[in-house]
């Protein structure tokens, strides 16, 4: 077994911990050895409890999930007469967990990349774009699933539009804007709307490149906390950010 050697406060949540354990074992994320991963995860939880640290409920929920998956995989296969005409591949008990891990990994990598861009642009100022079109007709937009790729595509399109407006760059020291501050700003802007709803690009108006990146990171964090949703009526249509009329606690 791999030696447990890490700080209890080093992880953002149970999925972050699982990715760390999988990386330590150097195993395929699509073929997780549930017995070993579950044992190490439970050792981590027990260590936190022995140190009299508060164990967040989400860690305990994941512990129960891992134990359930481990139990299913240890159950003996029933020997049944096989009808090869109707045979379907048996669902892997790990599939749902792997899907959550991959989605979290994509968000984490995207956030890391954007933070690197934020650091690169921290000493630059970009002239705001001219003549931004206002095309929101107030029509109710039906909710569809919006992927991280859809959001990154919309964000990159907005950056290209700023570039086409020929921003003037000058090296200056700018006031640092934290993600928490931008989260408050986004929620405040949404709460000012009657239906707590804004078109995606309206959250990024009159901002520098640095502020754009921070705003996008803030939006991802708000989605993670389920304080906002991003919706799209159909493929290639505008994205809308829907607030839930709540404040950050």
Curated annotation (Swiss-Prot):
Protein's cellular compartments: Cytoplasm
Keywords: Cell cycle, Cell division, Chromosome partition, Cytoplasm
Pfam families cross-referenced by the UniProt entry: SMC_ScpA
Superkingdom of source: Bacteria
Any Gene Ontology biological process: chromosome segregation
GO cellular component: cytoplasm
Keyword Cell division appears in the UniProt entry: yes
InterPro entries: ScpA, ScpA-like_C
Family: Belongs to the ScpA family.
Known role: Participates in chromosomal partition during cell division. May act via the formation of a condensin-like complex containing Smc and ScpB that pull DNA away from mid-cell into both cell halves.
NCBIfam families recorded: PRK00104.1-4
Quaternary state and interactors: Component of a cohesin-like complex composed of ScpA, ScpB and the Smc homodimer, in which ScpA and ScpB bind to the head domain of Smc. The presence of the three proteins is required for the association of the complex with DNA.
Protein name: Segregation and condensation protein A
Organism: Listeria monocytogenes serovar 1/2a (strain ATCC BAA-679 / EGD-e)
Underlying gene: scpA
